Amino acid sequence: MQQSTLLKPVSCYGIGVHSGKRTQLTIEPAKENTGIIFIRTDISSENNYIEASYFNVSDTLLSTTISNDHKVQISTIEHLMAALWGCSIDNAIIKIDGPEVPIMDGSSKPFVFMIECAGKKLQNAPKKYLKILKDIKVVHKDCELYCTPYDHMTVDLTIDFASKAIGRQNLTFSKQESFNQNIADARTFGFTKELDYLQSKGLAQGASFENAIGIDEQDKILNPNGLRYEDEFVRHKLLDLFGDLYTSGTSVVSSIKGYKTSHALNNELLHRIFSDTTSYKFVTNSEL
């Protein structure tokens, strides 16, 4: 299995769900072993490069934000990262003229469409995988996420919300190639009772029914067209998990189980993995 990048650049415009700012984003091809690199094109006075790595994650409140040593940051990268993972793109340069990745429709599907339009190019370097060698678990109150050694990637994820519109949902997933058809179009969601508070804190400035599922205080789905799936909520949480795990630099080969996961928990798991060199190794496809 070889590494891959895009055949040609592809661009989009959109607003940030939290900043409310309109930005242009371009995904460009990159050389072998580059990984995923973000560049803030609106900043030229200092280092504007940020590697999409777990160790550059600086904030996990409602989304995943990465920063560099110069405190240049880009937020809400997880939906784009999930699309890159789902399309098996190992190397890409992402140029953006603002502080936040556009939310698009609240899912990864628009980014998947962009990548498919650009096309994929195989490269002259072997693809590497992060193989887990021992059990690793992170817990915060009643939320937990753990991974165990396994010969391929499989995920069992459960969410549990007090809202009757969501409730308890479970989903298992084991085929990366089915991400684009079954997970990528699951949208982010939020509660109207929290909107005023979030906006008072400078968050959710760009939120609308065009880019998120809205749930009111009577547990009613407010979007005119309803849900895309009965279990769209857990599908989106799985999407978030894949996007966050891709900040490891590659696909994780492990049996993963999560309960009430979050961006913070996802990132903590990667820190826990990489803090112990005996818990993982990078392998090629022939070594799986």
UniProtKB/Swiss-Prot annotation:
Listed Gene3D superfamilies: lpxc deacetylase, domain 1, lpxc deacetylase, domain 2
Recorded GO MF terms: metal ion binding; UDP-3-O-acyl-N-acetylglucosamine deacetylase activity
Any Gene Ontology biological process: lipid A biosynthetic process
Cofactors demanded by this protein: Zn(2+)
InterPro entries assigned to the protein according to its UniProt record, in alphabetical order: Ribosomal_Su5_D2-typ_SF (IPR020568), UDP-acyl_GlcNac_deAcase (IPR004463), UDP-acyl_GlcNac_deAcase_C (IPR011334), UDP-acyl_N-AcGlcN_deAcase_N (IPR015870)
Catalysis: reaction(s): a UDP-3-O-[(3R)-3-hydroxyacyl]-N-acetyl-alpha-D-glucosamine + H2O = a UDP-3-O-[(3R)-3-hydroxyacyl]-alpha-D-glucosamine + acetate
Record: residues binding Zn(2+): 79, 236, 240
Signal sequence region: none
GO cellular component, one term: membrane
Metabolic or biological pathway: Glycolipid biosynthesis; lipid IV(A) biosynthesis; lipid IV(A) from (3R)-3-hydroxytetradecanoyl-[acyl-carrier-protein] and UDP-N-acetyl-alpha-D-glucosamine: step 2/6
EC number, UniProt record: 3.5.1.108
Keyword Metal-binding: yes
Keywords for this protein: Hydrolase, Lipid A biosynthesis, Lipid biosynthesis, Lipid metabolism, Metal-binding, Zinc
Catalytic residue positions: 263
UniProt KW Cytoplasm keyword: no
Record-linked PANTHER family: UDP-3-O-ACYL-N-ACETYLGLUCOSAMINE DEACETYLASE 1, MITOCHONDRIAL-RELATED (PTHR33694:SF1)
Protein role: Catalyzes the hydrolysis of UDP-3-O-myristoyl-N-acetylglucosamine to form UDP-3-O-myristoylglucosamine and acetate, the committed step in lipid A biosynthesis.
Family designation: Belongs to the LpxC family.
Protein's name in the database: UDP-3-O-acyl-N-acetylglucosamine deacetylase
Annotated source species: Rickettsia felis (strain ATCC VR-1525 / URRWXCal2) (Rickettsia azadi)
